[in-house]
């Protein structure tokens, strides 16, 4: 792993203006991912290298999805009745500068988090509504294999937990960790699903391809999650190539995510209409199997919504109103000047298009 000092020295960066950024939002980068960067300012660079604009964004929130408010046990988030999110560690192979959980970087990796499984497991065992557990973090696939085995085994001992999911960036950011042993371990706990974070075709290195192949050959259903990022992947050519290549690797594109409203990430955010426009273009370019859902995770913990005309109830100059999974009307802020294009787009798009 690179320290920021080592990375800056290698790339000839002046660290002085970036030191306050790194202090507020620490830097982590695997040597594998750094090796995929082809030049200063390229799409991979912009995802992981600190930017002074991270300290200038006052419009976002530390915890835009209200995960702390929805946490009934340490490191557990219970937003939907039959599903929970379990943050099993705080370590990542890279610190994505657009991360929703940037607030958790400040304390550094937590060893206590990895030692005390009891409260989360007890909560899951006691609430029989919970059928689906999503392991995230951090990154669960950075855990020692014995620890990962323990977590999966203990979840499988809970009869009402039917599905286990893992969210990870390891196959693309630190693929050497995906070994035959890891793939075989995960394959013992079916039904288990792995959703992999990929944002750009340049991340699909030969090593990443091999990691995905190992997992798929173990019979593990693979999906992908992609964040729509301004100037990085916000066009149909880039995303079309990414999604087509993922599908050929047996990784089903699952979500294209609108940027969360996290403090320090505003420079990555695209207009909502951009995502809608990109998906419309993709439907004419690639197989329907390769077209993901375009999703907004509503601020305040109101849940994910796949953006379709039927879910948008009204659009104003500064905000639109979206109906969430409970039928609740939720306000979502728009970028300045975004309203006319979004209104026009949704007006001309039928429900059946989706």
Model-derived regions: residue spans:
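Conserved AdoMet/S-adenosylmethionine-binding subsite of the radical SAM
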Residues: 118-125, 129-132, 141-286
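Mobile, glycine- and charge-enriched loop segments
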Residues: 98-99, 128, 209-234, 325-354
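C-terminal accessory regions of radical SAM enzymes
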Residues: 28, 279-354
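Short cysteine/histidine-rich metal-coordination sites, predominantly Zn2+-binding motifs
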Residues: 110-118
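N-terminal pre-triad scaffold of radical SAM enzymes
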Residues: 26, 72-101
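Iron-sulfur (Fe-S) cluster-binding segments and ferredoxin-like electron-carrier domains
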Residues: 99-111
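Conserved, mostly hydrophobic/aromatic
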Residues: 33, 96, 254
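Flexible, acidic/Gly-rich N-terminal and inter-domain linker regions that tether
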Residues: 1-79
């Amino acid at each position: 792993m690179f320290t920021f000092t080592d990375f800056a020295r290698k790339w000839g960066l002046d660290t002085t203006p970036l030191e306050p950024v790194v202090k507020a939002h620490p830097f982590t980068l695997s040597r594998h991912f750094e090796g995929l960067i082809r030049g200063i300012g390229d799409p991979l660079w912009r995802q992981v290298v600190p930017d002074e604009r991270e300290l200038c964004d006052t419009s976002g929130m530390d915890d835009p999805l209200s995960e702390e408010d929805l946490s009934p046990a340490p490191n557990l988030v219970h937003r939907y009745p039959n599903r929970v999110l379990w943050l099993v560690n705080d370590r990542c192979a890279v610190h994505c500068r657009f991360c929703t959980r940037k607030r958790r970087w400040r304390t550094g990796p937590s060893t206590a988090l990895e030692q005390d499984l009891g409260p989360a497991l007890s909560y899951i065992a006691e609430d029989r509504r919970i059928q689906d557990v999503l392991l995230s973090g951090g990154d669960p696939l950075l855990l020692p294999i014995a620890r990962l085995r323990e977590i999966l085994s203990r979840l499988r001992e809970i009869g009402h937990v039917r599905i286990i999911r893992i969210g990870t960036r390891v196959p693309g950011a630190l693929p050497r960790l995906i070994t035959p042993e890891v793939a075989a371990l995960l394959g013992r706990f079916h039904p288990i699903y792995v959703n992999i974070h990929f944002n750009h075709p340049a991340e699909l290195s030969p090593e990443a391809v091999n990691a995905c192949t190992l997992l798929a050959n173990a019979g593990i259903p693979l999906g992908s999650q992609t964040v729509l990022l301004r100037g990085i992947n916000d066009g149909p050519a880039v995303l079309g190539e990414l999604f087509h290549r993922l599908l050929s690797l047996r990784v089903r594109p699952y979500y294209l995510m609108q940027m969360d409203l996290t403090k320090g990430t505003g420079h990555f955010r695209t207009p909502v209409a951009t995502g809608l426009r990109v998906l419309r273009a993709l439907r004419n370019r690639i197989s329907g199997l390769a077209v993901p859902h375009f999703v907004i995770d509503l601020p305040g913990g109101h849940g994910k919504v796949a953006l379709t005309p039927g879910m948008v109830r009204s659009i104003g100059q500064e905000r639109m109103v979206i109906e969430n999974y409970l039928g609740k009307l939720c306000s979502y802020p728009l970028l300045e000047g975004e309203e006319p294009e979004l209104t026009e787009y949704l007006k001309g798009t039928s429900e059946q298009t989706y």
